[in-house]
Amino acid sequence: MAAQGFLLIATFLLVLMVLARPLGSGLAWLINDIPLPGTTGVERVLFSALGVSNHEMNWKQYLCAILGLNMLGLAVLFFMLLGQHYLPLNPQQLPGLSWDLALNTAVSFVTNTNWQSYSGETTLSYFSQMAGLTVQNFLSAASGIAVIFALIRAFTRQSMSTLGNAWVDLLRITLWVLVPVALVIALFFIQQGALQNFLPYQAVNTVEGAQQLLPMGPVASQEAIKMLGTNGGGFFNANSSHPFENPTALTNFVQMLAIFLIPTALCFAFGEVTGDRRQGRMLLWAMSVIFVICVGVVMWAEVQGNPHLLALGADSSINMEGKESRFGVLVSSLFAVVTTAASCGAVIAMHDSFTALGGMVPMWLMQIGEVVFGGVGSGLYGMMLFVLLAVFIAGLMIGRTPEYLGKKIDVREMKLTALAILVTPTLVLMGAALAMMTDAGRSAMLNPGPHGFSEVLYAVSSAANNNGSAFAGLSANSPFWNCLLAFCMFVGRFGVIIPVMAIAGSLVSKKSQPASSGTLPTHGPLFVGLLIGTVLLVGALTFIPALALGPVAEYLS
């Protein structure tokens, strides 16, 4: 089984790198504000029709454009969900959502979290799924990519005040990256057997003679951007373990590739735009090392079997509880790490049924900020915060002013970096504490003891870091949990984007200094180790006490 696991990981990473490399070159064109071949005429017509100019924006204007678009999307989606029963494409006559669930869902999809306190097939109409959630899947992904575009430009430009035009970036990202790739993936899913229709739910007779109601809907089109945009919200409650969403082993492999495709391509693009491809490879090496170790730990933990079943004398050579037999332990373990290393949150197995250590690793990957490949855009700008922190620490050790890519990292940048890094840990720890201190929070726990606390900690970690996956033993559809998690999702998203954009605004105004004999190389194995150590150190110091009360205590009990 060890050989199978190694082959699975190696094949996945090899295919990923092959696909991401050319996409990274295309993204580099867009970052450099160069239209892709054959798109100039279309862009001219669209920009003219929409009133979009090529006038560049400073960081505040760029940020306001991103925030304005997202706030408008939040309001539209909120009222759409409230009035769902008045809108078309609702063959099941599903009612509108309660205000707290509508708020939670709207915030969830606008922030690229896709936390779901509802069951899609019994709660949302086709119109809400398509015009509401799927649209936000595109816009939230484009927003994250636009932010990293601005940050990369800040490193490559000198003595300037502008970072590009947010509207141009958003349109280009959506039209030339997200829509075409998602279309290809959706067509492949349809060919493999995923649903794509507007039929009412179908009553069928089973082999045993019972009657069953099969949900229908435009699944494949939402499934494609759900993965490509690292959104993660399933059309059905079972998410990607449902055969109508993920019908074959091949679609499952493509889904995992789609999750990491753009985050990996952005690393290649970063190297091209900065003029030093080693910088992009350095980031990929750091991410890949952490990723492979985490996959190995989860696979090892899950093939050991369930200790609780073993204690009862049951046969549990491997832990198959909560897993699809058509995928198995190794694929389920790989998918769990992929979906939590990125900000996706889609699942093919119930993370709540993983072993204590097997469930702790996905939780920890979210808690460190989902910087191991991470979400589209958000993963790379999150990792860049750790790069700046690592450069600062190295500068202190050698007694020189820290610099990265020729830009000096001063007090302002470090204050903003520290602020951005501290946002999500503060939300996670305070949110979990609030939930455990209140009756409304504790009443949602279906399990006592360390595992019950793990469910709470996982939920808040998932929301604050915009992942969206869950330990499903938590009954989160209540006003308390819907409001708490909506707050965590909102602040966890925009509370990081704001300081990141401020950092970009500060860096773009600086001149690049030529490298000297005292400059720390940031492209070699030494810096890779320093960066990994910084990520691990911050994650360990912040969350070890909380993890000790949850999964660690469960493992030792």
Curated annotation (Swiss-Prot):
Location(s), subcellular: Cell inner membrane
NCBIfam families xref list: kdpA (TIGR00680)
Family in the record: Belongs to the KdpA family.
Encoding gene (name): kdpA
Protein role: Part of the high-affinity ATP-driven potassium transport (or Kdp) system, which catalyzes the hydrolysis of ATP coupled with the electrogenic transport of potassium into the cytoplasm. This subunit binds the periplasmic potassium ions and delivers the ions to the membrane domain of KdpB through an intramembrane tunnel.
Main location: membrane
Entry keyword set: Cell inner membrane, Cell membrane, Ion transport, Membrane, Potassium, Potassium transport, Transmembrane, Transmembrane helix, Transport
Protein name: Potassium-transporting ATPase potassium-binding subunit
Species for this entry: Escherichia coli O157:H7
